[in-house]
Amino acid sequence: MDIRPLAIPGSFVVTPKIHGDDRGEFVEWFRADLLKKATGLDFSVAQANLSVSAKGTLRGIHFADVPPGQAKYVMCSSGSIEDYVVDIRVGSPTFGAWDRAIISASERNAIVLDVGLGHAFLALEDNTTVTYLVTDQFKPHAEHAINPLDEDLGLKFALPARELLLSEKDTSAPGFLAAQAAGLLPTWQG
């Protein structure tokens, strides 16, 4: 299992070893012990989620109140996504920066986000199925969003804006600076 950091502290891409033969494949896609050894993150799964998206679906930027926050381990069981990590932690050396990685069922790779990071993804294929392992249960009162099309963040997408499908929640979410001014963003704990 290869675990490499992204440009945002607390985010990583995990690429597992694929064991294949004439019968198919076997993949060990999550190992808490190896993740902790490589990243220092103590990832205790509290909930597993699954979403199925049409091509062009853009979900996020989502984040939870800290504490307790919600670390995520995100992989595709079918299709592919362009996955975004946004540093929304006030005081972080990379505050306001973002990074992305392609996560796909064919590569069996995953992205890991520590508590306090913003997360979004763009489905690159129809029927893209994303599986999330998270460290805290979903709590609607503690969940927030930032508009992923906010110009202050400047996220770049693999598809043109006219092809993006967003929920009403994400479309009406505040921009990055408005969320900061409202005191919604977590504080850097580094």
Question: Which stretches of residues belong to each language-model region?
Answer:
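Non-catalytic, conserved peripheral segments adjacent to functional cores
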Residues: 1-106, 125-127, 134-190
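Short, conserved beta-strand edge motifs with alternating hydrophobic and charged residues
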Residues: 84, 112-114
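Ligand-binding loop in jelly-roll beta-barrel domains
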Residues: 108, 115-131
